[in-house]
């Protein structure tokens, strides 16, 4: 179990003297989050509430029809993401924002005994036990992480090269739980995309240099952990 602790920095007062010139100041405005946390919620635990999935996380693969005359191949795959990576990434992203006094990550998969992947909310007793054991005020649970990849190779006649792209859309779902409350306080469904590309003189060369399936799932799972943060905290 990893903990993230932060110290509050005390800023000294600034001595303002007289000046003869006036500078134009720019002010950055923060946009409100979709979720509002009471001031009493200062310590949060990020937990993995997904079942273990097989090493092969591919759900389904579809070879699609080419959508332009310059396309050589197009393949769409659907995956379960790596929940452990996404949970850790989410905890780190929350900690980096310095919004909460403490962010704790629970590495264990709470649904590790599930045979088939499924969404299952935490019970009131589970939430109470976790918040007490982890000494936190509330929980943010990763409930689901799925992704869709679109792998495409095209010929670029103006440049005389082949261009390979991998575009992955991630769909993380997180829920917020408070102790002594029946069911989650709120569910946040979010999505975003991450992109890779390679160019070369031959189709085979481009295929071999495009990101592998294993690395794609790892990097997309890590990226997915950062996506819900802008819905949870001001930005």
Predicted regions and their residues:
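C-terminal/domain-edge helix-coil "capping" segments
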Residues: 20-41, 169, 175-235
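Generic short beta-strand segments
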Residues: 49-52, 143-151, 191-195
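Soluble periplasmic/extracytoplasmic beta-strand elements of cell-envelope proteins
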Residues: 45-48, 139-143, 169-175
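C-terminal motif of bacterial Sec signal peptides marking the signal peptidase cleavage site
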Residues: 15-18
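Outer-membrane beta-barrel translocator domains and adjoining extracellular loop/strand segments
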Residues: 153-158, 201-203
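N-terminal segment of the mature soluble domain
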Residues: 50-141, 145, 181-186
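Bacterial N-terminal signal peptides that target proteins for export
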Residues: 1-8
């Amino acid at each position: 179990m990893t903990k993230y602790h932060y110290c509050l920095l005390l800023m000294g007062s600034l001595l303002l003297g007289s000046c003869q010139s006036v500078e134009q100041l720019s002010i950055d405005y923060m946009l409100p989050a979709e979720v509002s946390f009471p001031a009493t919620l200062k310590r949060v635990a990020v937990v993995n509430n997904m079942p273990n999935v097989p090493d092969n996380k591919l759900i389904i693969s579809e070879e699609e029809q080419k959508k332009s005359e310059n396309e050589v191949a197009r393949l769409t795959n659907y995956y379960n993401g790596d929940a452990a990576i996404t949970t850790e990434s989410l905890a780190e992203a929350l900690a980096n924002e310095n919004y909460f006094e403490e962010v704790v990550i629970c590495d264990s998969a709470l649904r590790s005994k599930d045979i088939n992947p499924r969404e299952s909310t935490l019970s009131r007793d589970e939430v109470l036990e976790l918040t007490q054991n982890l000494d936190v005020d509330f929980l943010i649970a990763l409930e689901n992480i799925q992704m869709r990849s679109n792998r495409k190779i095209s010929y670029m006649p103006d440049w005389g090269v082949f261009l390979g792209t991998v575009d992955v859309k991630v769909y993380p779902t997180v829920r917020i739980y408070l102790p002594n409350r029946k069911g989650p306080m709120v569910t946040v469904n979010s999505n975003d995309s991450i992109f890779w590309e390679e160019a070369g003189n031959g189709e085979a060369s481009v295929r071999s240099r495009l990101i592998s399936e294993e690395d794609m799932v790892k990097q997309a799972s890590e990226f997915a952990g950062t996506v819900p943060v802008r819905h949870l905290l001001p930005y």
